[in-house]
Amino acid sequence: MTVDAAKLSTEFCTVTPEALTAVRDSQGKYFASLMKVDPDKFAADTLDPRKAEDMANVLEEYTSLKGKKVLEIGTGCGVNHIVWQKKYDIEAWGLEPEGEGFENSTDVARKLIRANRLDPLRVKDAVGEAIPFPDNSFDIVYSSNVLEHVINPAKVLREAVRVLKPGGTLQIVCPNYLSYFDGHHAAFHPPIISNRFFRWWIKWIYRRDPAFAATIRTEINPLWARRQLKEISYSTPLTVLSLGEEKFIERMDQADVSQWMALGILGRLVSFLRRLGINRFLARLIVVLRGWTPLIITATKNT
C-alpha cells in the first residue's frame, strides 16, 4: 500500500491501514479494469474524509446538517457516516447492502466506524426499496452514486420520501445517462437510450467487459427524475429545489471538476475548454440538452 493512512486521516475521520488494504484488494482491483484507475488511488479516494466534506458542502447549500437526524442510503465504506457525525453532530443512520463490485463494503464500514469509536450497528444491512424505518423519521435523506445501482430506483425515491419528515430535505446524487461521460468506466459516450446500447458501447468502443454496465440503471436522467417526483407529489407534496444544473454550470464556469477516481480525465477536458474560452457557452448548451452530470436531485417534503 503506497498510501499513508495517517496522512489521509483528518480530525473528523481516522482512516486505518486495514481499511485501505481491504478496499484496494477488493473494490480497487475490481474497478481497475473498468476505470483504468490504480487500486491504491481507488482506495485512497474512496476513504478520503475530504470527499465527505465536499459532499456536505453541496448539501448545505440547501439545508444545515448541524444536529440533524440523517439517513444515508448507501453508506459505502462509512466515511460520510463518520465525518458527518463528528463534524456536524448529526444522528447518523445508514443502509448498505453489498452488491456487484462492493461485496465487502459493509464489513469495511463497520470496522472503520468502530475504529472511530462510533456505533457500527447504525449501519443496517438493508436496501433502499424497503427502508426499515417508520414514516417521517429523518430530517435529511441523502444518497450519492447509489441510485444507478439499485433494482428499482423509482421505489427507492418513494421510500426516501416516505421516511423523510415534513419540512425535511432529500438529496440524491447520481449519474445522468443523457450526459456524455460515465465515471464507472471513465468513458465518454452519446446520450444513453437503453442499457443494451450502453453495454454495446462499453464492449465495442472501449473494449471492456460489459458485465458491470449491465447492472446500471441507465434510464436515470432529468426527464425520468422529474416524472418520478411528480408522481410522488400526487400523494406526498414535494418542492423540487434543483436537479443539479446550477452546480454543473458553476463547476464548468470555474473549471472546478473533482479529481476523485476517474474524473481527472474529465477535469482535463474542462480545463482545455476553458482555455479555448467556450466552457461557459458549452455548459449552458449542455443544460438545454439535459446532458449535465451528475444529477443532484434535491427536494423538500412539504409540511
What are these regions (language model features)?
Residues 48-67:
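Conserved alpha-helix/loop element of class I SAM-dependent methyltransferases that forms part
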Residues 68-76:
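Conserved class I S-adenosyl-L-methionine
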Residues 79-130:
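Class I SAM-dependent methyltransferase SAM/SAH-binding core
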Residues 129-140:
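A short acidic, Gly/Pro-enriched loop at the edge of an enzyme's catalytic core
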Residues 143-146:
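A short beta-strand submotif of the Rossmann-like class I SAM-dependent methyltransferase core
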Residues 150-159:
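A short, conserved alpha-helix within the catalytic core of class I
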Residues 150-151, 164-166:
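Helix-to-beta-strand junctions that scaffold the AdoMet/dcAdoMet cofactor pocket
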Residues 154-155, 169-298:
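S-adenosyl-L-methionine-dependent methyltransferase catalytic module, highlighting the catalytic core
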